[in-house]
């Protein structure tokens, strides 16, 4: 990976999400770069947007600077898709962790849901239980915080 952390790029990320939600050091980004079960690699930054506008702004700046964007929800590491895979990328990689974007909205009396990027299967199960409904998948990883989006992306 190139690791070209320009001060301007870093400052733009901090301006969007604040210093608390823009992480750059190896130690402070370690848990985001390592899956619980599998996966490990490098990233020049980990960004934790707190709303969809911040998410959009972060993605815009990353794309404009030709960074690789790795969207991360629960980072369970069950499939390896939520962490970088080594250090051999041809460009800098930025992890965007969506754990703060965890809203779920029930639509049409619970017949449909709108799940934000960081929403968990556990939370979805809790919301649907009073309606005698179940989520698209009922799997063991619900209890460790697996995301709705991760479940859909991995066909579970």
Please state what every model-predicted region is.
Residues 1-37, 65-69, 74:
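N-terminal accessory segments
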Residues 18-19, 40-41, 80-81:
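Glycine-centered flexibility motif
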Residues 32-38, 101-106:
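Short, flexible, solvent-exposed loop/turn segments with mixed acidic/basic and small polar residues
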Residues 36-48:
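Short, basic, glycine/proline-bearing loop/turn elements
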Residues 52-156:
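FAD-binding glycine-rich core of flavoenzymes that anchor FAD
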């Amino acid at each position: 990976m190139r690791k070209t952390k320009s001060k301007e790029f870093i400052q733009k990320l901090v301006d969007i999400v604040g210093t608390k939600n823009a992480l750059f050091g190896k130690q402070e980004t370690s848990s985001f770069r390592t899956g619980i079960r599998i996966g490990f690699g490098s990233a020049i930054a980990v960004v934790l947007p707190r709303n969809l506008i911040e998410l959009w702004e972060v993605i815009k700046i990353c794309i404009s600077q030709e960074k690789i964007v790795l969207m991360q929800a629960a980072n369970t590491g069950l499939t390896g898709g939520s962490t970088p895979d080594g250090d051999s990328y041809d460009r800098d990689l930025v992890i965007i962790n969506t754990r703060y974007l965890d809203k779920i909205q029930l639509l049409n009396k619970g017949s449909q849901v709108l799940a934000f990027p960081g929403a968990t299967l556990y939370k979805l199960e809790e919301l649907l239980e009073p309606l005698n409904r179940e989520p698209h998948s009922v799997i063991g990883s619900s209890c460790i915080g697996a995301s709705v989006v991760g479940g859909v992306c991995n066909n579970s």
